[in-house]
Amino acid sequence: MTLNTDLIRTRCLEIEESVSRLERLQALSRDAFLADQDTLDLACYRLLVAIEAALALCYHVSAKRLHRVPEEYAQCFANLRDASIIPADLTERL
């Protein structure tokens, strides 16, 4: 089965946009960051978007290339590592 390049492109863009928004928040001091509920909400939302996009990519690749999907989120990236689709150091970070 072939990978859905539109899905992959969309999810990668979601991750890139989220990381970019989160990186901009690094300019804030810790106190300023923690004092602003809207900023905290934005950070939480962008983290969730990036995590969901990464998992969607993982499950898509698992289904199409490995012909199976893991029962647990944590196992998804390990399956791709074991199949030599992603490097071990990336698996550890994810």
Name the predicted role of every residue range.
Residues 1-94:
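Solvent-exposed interaction patches of small proteins and small membrane subunits
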